[in-house]
Regions:
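Sec-dependent signal peptide recognition
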Residues: 1-9
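C-terminal motif of bacterial Sec signal peptides marking the signal peptidase cleavage site
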Residues: 13-14
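N-terminal "domain-start" segment that seeds a small globular fold
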Residues: 20-52, 72, 136-137
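Amphipathic alpha-helical repeat scaffolds
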Residues: 43, 63-67
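Proline/glycine-enriched tight loop/beta-turn segments at coil->beta junctions
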Residues: 54-59
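Structural microenvironment flanking redox-active thiols in thiol-disulfide oxidoreductases
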Residues: 70-136
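Thiol-/selenol-based redox modules, centered on thioredoxin-like
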Residues: 137-140, 144-192
């Protein structure tokens, strides 16, 4: 009888490591997520932009367009940037022509438009695609749970905002229609 009991206990413990291995691999998924600091992109002037230079700063990544009903958000983005740029916060704009061809211009035309109409001084990157088969790798990172460790999501429209912490990890996604000075964005920036 003792042998049967001992064998039962032994079998029970023999089965447990598989569960432990499974839960251990599930628990390690977040450690496999990427940081935006791993990316190097091209800015609107054709120069290399290394996101690792932003370590220690909170980052807002936003896809932009010049001929969209939300284009006036450039004004709010610029005001937000000027208020917090000296407090370890930066906005990175990515022009994209994915929604109703609302960003048809060249990089030079986009830069001129942003400067002339909104005084944009936050870093603007070269025009990319934020969805579909031509999606830029940085947006694959932002929209894929396997890469960002937060969630799968889609860019819904121009001016969708991605908030990343000082380590470059995605923390929050803000809908396009939410203004840059929205209380939830301000709270996130100011949170220690």
């Amino acid at each position: 009888m003792f042998n049967i009991y001992a064998l039962s206990v032994l079998c029970l413990f023999a089965c447990m490591p598989n569960e432990s291995k499974q839960s251990m691999s599930e628990n390690t998924l977040p450690s496999m997520k990427k940081s935006i600091h791993e990316f190097i992109v091209t800015d609107i002037n054709g120069q290399s932009f290394d996101f690792s230079t932003l370590k220690g700063k909170k980052i807002m990544v936003v896809n932009t367009a010049s001929k969209c009903g939300l284009t006036p958000q450039y004004k709010g983005l610029e005001a937000l940037y000027n208020t917090y740029k000296d407090k370890n916060f930066v906005i990175i704009g990515f022009p994209a022509n994915d929604f109703m061809a609302q960003e048809p211009g060249t990089n030079e035309e986009i830069a001129t438009f942003c400067s002339k109409n909104y005084g944009v001084s936050f870093p603007m990157m070269s025009k990319i695609s934020v969805k579909g088969k031509d999606m830029h790798p940085i947006y694959r990172f932002l929209t894929s749970l396997n890469e960002n460790g937060l969630e799968d999501n889609q860019v819904k429209w121009n001016f969708q905002k991605y908030l990343l912490n000082e380590e470059g990890f995605l923390e929050k996604i803000i809908p396009p229609s939410t203004e840059p000075d929205d209380e939830q964005i301000i709270r996130w920036i100011e949170a220690g």
